[in-house]
Amino acid sequence: MNFYFLPEPTIHGGIKVGFQFAAMLRQLEIDVVIATPNGSAPQWFSSQLPVLSQEKVIPNLTPKDRVIFSLPYDYDKLKKLPARMIFHCQGTDSAIIPILQDEKVEILTCWTQAEDFVSEFLRDSENVGISVSRNFYYSGESKLSRSYATMPRRGVLPFPEKLNGFKEYQIDNMHEDVASQILKHSSGFLALSENEWFGLPSLEAMASGCIVVSPKTLGGVEYLIAGENCFVEKVENLSELMSEVLRSEQKHQHLRQRALEMSYRYHPRAQFKKLQKLFISGGLKFLR
């Protein structure tokens, strides 16, 4: 049996990525359940996955079981358990180095930058991909001109006065069904966090038909292509650039279309097909 250990399911992209991955494994007839502290389930996105209490799962684990985890700080606790370990890598800082040095741990990655980082430690990994929830995909909703969306918990917007006169929608502490509707009706999306591991909110905004203005990211370089499907700028220049974009939206419609096209590479169908191929090739045999 596979048990995916996740922390308290607060609003963090890694939580949703874990649930999405587990859901696809179940579609592929792989036995997997989620284990969280006290068995708490997420309230900010929809999921039909069974969720168990970590406290109840841990005493019953055997060497035949597998524990999947993505939070590096869970490693010290989980390595003491009899189950085999699988690390679902969603970030590449020094906290994951002890995990990479443990050859008993199987490694899964979600994007190319993480895959490359893992290989620097002479470890093989399987890139299982990442996907945007279906409800974010644009389907012809009307866009409010001169409007943009932000996620204030991701960072502080410098020089906000440069965006006076434009309509701002703040996505904060809400269900993703509401967030997706905001993005579908917003003309632009202003990312605030520099050097994100991947930057899933920007990709969700691209799927929603937004013109994205973003600081540089790490893993996000595989989908954020400056000048082709988005704008990438220094943090201190983000407000001014967003205002320029919103003043001349029609001139940038090609970015909106290219962004939407790019986002379909991360549609759930694409990730599911990727996983199917990995199982057929034997790359994920340790999950069976």
Label each residue range with its predicted role.
Residues 6-17:
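A short, glycine/small-residue-rich beta-strand->loop->alpha-helix junction that serves as a flexible
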Residues 236, 247-286:
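A charged, aromatic-enriched C-terminal amphipathic alpha-helix characteristic of glycosyltransferases
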Residues 33, 39-103:
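Extended catalytic core of nucleotide-activated donor transferases of GT-like folds
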Residues 211-214:
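Short hydrophobic beta-strand element within catalytic cores of glycosyltransferases
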Residues 194:
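Aromatic "clamp/platform" in nucleotide-sugar-dependent glycosyltransferases that forms part
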Residues 226-237, 244-250:
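Conserved acidic donor-binding segment of nucleotide-sugar-dependent glycosyltransferases
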Residues 17, 110, 114-180:
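Conserved catalytic-core segment of nucleotide-activated headgroup transferases in glycan assembly
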Residues 180, 203-207, 221-222:
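Short alpha-helical segment that forms part of, or immediately flanks, the ligand-binding pocket
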